[in-house]
Amino acid sequence: MSTTFCSSVSMQATSLAATTRISFQKPALVSTTNLSFNLRRSIPTRFSISCAAKPETVEKVSKIVKKQLSLKDDQKVVAETKFADLGADSLDTVEIVMGLEEEFDIEMAEEKAQKIATVEEAAELIEELVQLKK
C-alpha cells in the first residue's frame, strides 16, 4: 500500500468581489493505491471552420480576391484566408471591396468594409447585404 503524508494543504480562490482562503492545517493521510491518472497526451484532431456563407459566394469572393491581388491561379484562397496573409494592404482591401460591390451589385458601409479581414467575413457580409436589398 502506497500512502502519501500531507501536512498542509492550502487553496486560494480569488474573485472580483471577494477573496476566500481555505486552509487545512491538520495532517492528512492519503492513500494512492486506488488512484489512476490518464497521462496520455491528447492529440489535437483536425478541425475546420464552417462559415454561414454559401460555398458559391465564398468561391466568387475568392476569385475576386485573386483577381484584385493578381494572384496566380494555383494560389489557394479559401474561406479562412486572411487578406493580410495574401500581402494585401489597406489600398488593396479597398480595391477588393470595390470589386465585390460591383460583382454583387451592393454597397458596403465604410465601417463594415473596414472590419473585413477574411474571405469568409466578406462572403457573410455580402450575403447579409444581398438579403437586405431584397
Swiss-Prot record:
Pathway: Lipid metabolism; fatty acid biosynthesis. SUPFAM superfamilies: ACP-like (SSF47336). It holds the Pfam family PP-binding. InterPro entries: ACP (IPR003231), ACP-like_sf (IPR036736), ACP_chloroplastic (IPR044813), PKS_PP-bd (IPR020806), PP-bd_ACP (IPR009081), Ppantetheine_attach_site (IPR006162). 4'-phosphopantetheine is transferred from CoA to a specific serine of apo-ACP by acpS. This modification is essential for activity because fatty acids are bound in thioester linkage to the sulfhydryl of the prosthetic group. Keywords: Chloroplast, Fatty acid biosynthesis, Fatty acid metabolism, Lipid biosynthesis, Lipid metabolism, Phosphopantetheine, Phosphoprotein, Plastid, Transit peptide. This is Acyl carrier protein SF2, chloroplastic. It comes from Brassica campestris (Field mustard). The lineage of its organism: Eukaryota, Viridiplantae, Streptophyta, Embryophyta, Tracheophyta.
